[in-house]
């Protein structure tokens, strides 16, 4: 669906915008090395600061004690042809920010964000010393929506995706399989989904409070 070379004991906000400037993502690393991200659309908050990271087995923590090694910005604008679909040619135009982090145990984590004119995505790329796999116990990635609205989703289920879609206020969704599509009260349509799962568990959305998942 993700150069600053000096870390200090203070918050470190880093920003990335869509090519047309309408969507802005802000990444922040606080004094404890904890990561959050936030998103605004058209200058208005869309996702308020939300947690990132994972907790693994045997004390592995991919959510705190990190320092920024460097941050790299790139832009890509290309057109590719899909074999079938509504449109034959697809424009792939985005700005990318790769935030490279390291903790005291020399665990390295790259957060790769891509912001398009019509959405954004991010992914985790991690390298843990002396292990060939990571047993994930908890995913801390959250989506703290700034506004309520109308949503369309199916209930979270580990057995099937063949369930009836329900229409509910975002704040009334207790859990959901992705994609969860919604329209905020100020008219922004969006959908939360995942992609490129390689040897990794699928995600479900769990309501915590308000419009937070």
Language-model features and meaning:
Residues 1-7:
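Sec-dependent N-terminal signal peptides
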Residues 13-213:
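N-terminal accessory beta-strand-rich subdomains and adjacent acidic, glycine-rich linkers
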């Amino acid at each position: 669906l993700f150069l600053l070379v000096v870390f200090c004991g203070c918050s470190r906000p880093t920003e990335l915008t869509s090519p047309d400037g309408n969507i802005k993502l802000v990444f922040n690393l606080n004094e404890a090395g904890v990561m959050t991200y936030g998103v605004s659309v058209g200058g208005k908050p869309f996702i308020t600061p939300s947690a990132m990271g994972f907790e693994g087995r045997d004390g592995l923590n991919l959510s705190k004690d990190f320092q920024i090694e460097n941050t790299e910005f790139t832009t890509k604008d290309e057109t590719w042809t899909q074999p079938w679909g509504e449109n034959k040619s697809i424009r792939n135009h985005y700005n990318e920010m790769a935030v490279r982090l390291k903790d005291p145990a020399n665990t390295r984590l790259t957060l790769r964000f891509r912001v398009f004119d019509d959405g954004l995505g991010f992914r985790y790329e991690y390298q843990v010393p002396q292990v060939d796999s990571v047993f994930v116990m908890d995913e801390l990635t959250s989506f703290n929506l700034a506004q309520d609205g109308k949503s369309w989703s199916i209930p979270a289920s580990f057995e099937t995706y063949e369930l009836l879609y329900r229409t509910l206020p975002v704040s009334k969704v207790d859990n959901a399989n992705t994609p969860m599509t919604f329209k905020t009260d100020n008219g922004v349509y969006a959908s939360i989904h995942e992609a490129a799962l390689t040897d990794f568990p699928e995600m479900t959305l769990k309501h915590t409070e308000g419009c937070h998942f």
